[in-house]
Swiss-Prot record:
Organism phylogeny: Bacteria, Pseudomonadati, Pseudomonadota, Gammaproteobacteria, Pasteurellales
Molecular function GO labels: 3'-5'-RNA exonuclease activity; tRNA binding; tRNA nucleotidyltransferase activity
Residues annotated as binding phosphate: 86, 124-126
Name of the protein in its database record: Ribonuclease PH
One protein family per Pfam: RNase_PH
Listed GO biological process terms: rRNA catabolic process; rRNA processing; tRNA processing
Keyword vocabulary terms for this entry: Nucleotidyltransferase, RNA-binding, rRNA processing, Transferase, tRNA processing, tRNA-binding
Class of this enzyme: transferase
Domain of life: Bacteria
Database matches in CDD domains: RNase_PH_bact (cd11362)
Subunit structure of this chain's protein: Homohexameric ring arranged as a trimer of dimers.
Family according to the record: Belongs to the RNase PH family.
Task of the protein: Phosphorolytic 3'-5' exoribonuclease that plays an important role in tRNA 3'-end maturation. Removes nucleotide residues following the 3'-CCA terminus of tRNAs; can also add nucleotides to the ends of RNA molecules by using nucleoside diphosphates as substrates, but this may not be physiologically important. Probably plays a role in initiation of 16S rRNA degradation (leading to ribosome degradation) during starvation.
Length: 244
């Protein structure tokens, strides 16, 4: 039996709150159940040196966890003096996922950085980050259009991500921490709206998984991500504004 008696193909309750903080061009609090991530998108009128003169922009991301985002305090990476390998892997994944839905030429010579800060972690922090960051990026780009800095929308659609896995021999969608820590197979899937895949990260933690199980997990991921796309669309169509 899953936590909260969830069906195997159902995501946790998903909540996306736009305009969560005051200063960022795009700001979203995304919640996958008890996992909560703040995603802030910042626009800078410059590009990395390797793109100077290339007539295109850049989208990148940074990721971090607050010290008490987990059950016990974790030292800030700034205090350690360097980022961990997991952090660098996740922020690169977020950035690649966002670039998959942006026409960098149409963005112009500017950079959008999305900072994803995990407030509370209960599994799926990277997938929640991607899903929330997409909405924050959308809002930042819309501000550029509203301010007359862009003539056309460089965003080609939505991107979202979800975790799937095999727990106690059962394929399940959107794993909570207690499931993730006991999964025989753990997989993260990133997808755009037309069903094409951006990235698949899958690992057998114990028993290897079969080709048939891989296809089953991908089908389960697609069904879960469709639920996330719907949550994104609802948030973007709403007049949600957390700032008063």
């Amino acid at each position: 039996m899953r936590p909260n008696n969830r069906p195997v193909d159902q995501t946790r309750p998903v909540k996306i709150t736009r305009n969560y903080t005051r200063y960022a061009e795009g700001s979203v609090l995304v919640e996958f159940g008890e996992t909560k991530v703040l995603c802030n998108a910042t626009v800078e009128e410059t590009v990395p040196r390797f793109l100077k003169g290339q007539q295109q922009g850049w989208v990148t991301a940074e990721y971090g966890m607050l010290p008490r985002a987990t059950h016990s305090r974790t030292q800030r990476e700034a205090a350690k003096g360097k980022q961990g390998g997991r952090t660098m892997e996740i922020q690169r994944l977020i950035a690649r996922s966002l670039r998959a839905v942006v026409d960098l030429k149409a963005l112009g010579e500017r950079t959008i950085t999305v900072d994803c800060d995990v407030i509370q972690a209960d599994g799926g922090t990277r997938t929640a980050s991607i899903t929330g960051a997409c909405v924050a990026l959308h809002d930042a780009i819309n501000k550029l259009i509203a301010d007359g800095l862009l003539k056309e929308n460089p965003m080609k659609g939505l991107v979202a991500a979800i975790s799937v896995g095999i727990v106690d021999g059962q394929a399940v969608c959107d794993l909570e921490y207690v499931e993730d820590s006991n999964a025989e197979t753990d997989m993260n899937v990133v997808m755009v709206e037309d069903g094409r895949l951006v990235e698949v990260q899958g690992t057998a933690e114990g028993e290897p998984f079969s080709h048939m199980e891989l296809l089953q997990l991908l089908d389960l991921a697609q069904k879960g991500i469709e639920q996330l796309f719907e949550a994104q669309r609802q948030a973007l169509n709403a007049t949600s504004d957390a700032i008063r």
